[in-house]
Amino acid sequence: MNAAIIFVLLFVLMLTGMPISISLGLTVLTFLFTMTQVPIESVALKLFTGIEKFEIMAIPFFILAGNFLTHGGVARRMINFATSMVGHWHGGLGLAGVMACALFAAVSGSSPATVVAIGSILLPAMVKQGFPKGFGAGVITTSGALGILIPPSIVMVMYSVSTNTSVGALFMAGVIPGLMLATLLGLTTWWKARKNDYPRMPKVGWGARLKAFRESAWGLLLIVVVMGGIYTGLFTPTEAAAMSAVYAFVVAVFVYKDMGLKQVPKVLLDSANMSAMLLYIITNAVLFSFLMTSEQIPQAMADWLIGKGLGPIAFLLVVNVLLLLAGNVMEPSSIVLIMAPILFPVATKLGIDPVHFGILITVNMEVGMCHPPVGLNLYVASGITKMGITELTIAVWPWLLTMLVFLVLVTYWPPLSLWLPKALGVM
């Protein structure tokens, strides 16, 4: 009964148009002060202790690094390198877009940032070369979602904070699924381009490819710094995030020199605004998780599902459907922070690995970024292409279907996400 009251109250507040962060906080306060005897001091204490976790600091640092890389010329050099490698195949610039998104995802940690950085440069070039606008938008919108699967990933950090799962293990677990999804999206792009005889670029020699690689090497080296540092134990994921922010600043301002010192304050301010928004959501989500735990709702749900004889296969199917539906009304950060603390105890009781479960949730969030009505990547791509959301939704379907097939693969083949972290000894 209490669970029903909590969720009805939350959805009613959300339907009024109230921001999700305020809806969460108001739901918790209303329920606690009208239905329980919890002292107000404990709520205030939870607000501060809930966001004291060291791992949370990774979020603003990865956001800052992504902003420096977006404005610092790294994306343009990655696109040039990707184009030199695959531009001569069917749908050359489209394939270059997939590859560039995968490379930028490995240094940014954010899907919308990837779409902005790659799409703002590549989409006008694709239209100019004769590609239909819908084709380019479909490629970049869906490939940009790799930003939260290929590590580092802000969504994985949020899952880690919500469930106390190792961030390092999650990052390593996202590598193979991320590369596989990039390959599948590339194959979809190639197939559609070949079917419709879209333009190809002239093949360039290895000298030009080597030159493009050297120009992009400073950006690509950040992948080695972050992942290599975590794997070797040189620094924690949070320290890796701080290192990536400093490294991105140095590369953007002093190496590539595409950004002057006068632009740095604006980048810092934009990063602070985005970080404040996410941290405010996290703060209220921590309160919501505290309420769930105090009312023993996750435990009750786990006992009920197990009592009904629901096994891991059926449970994971239910989770996928639930998360895809949630993606229609909420953005990924809110979904992870609300749903992970509820679903995680059930998953562990059913013997599902926490790292595998985290990758499954992340892939669901990727799909949610690309379908209406609140798919963030759709709105970002719409701003770049000036296409309507309905038109964009139709354009992304071939790639979205590929992502749904991949979701099934990730869900029911755990070694896909677990093999690498186990082989590296991080879990």
How would you name each of these model-derived features?
Residues 1-427:
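Alpha-helical transmembrane segments of multi-pass membrane transport proteins
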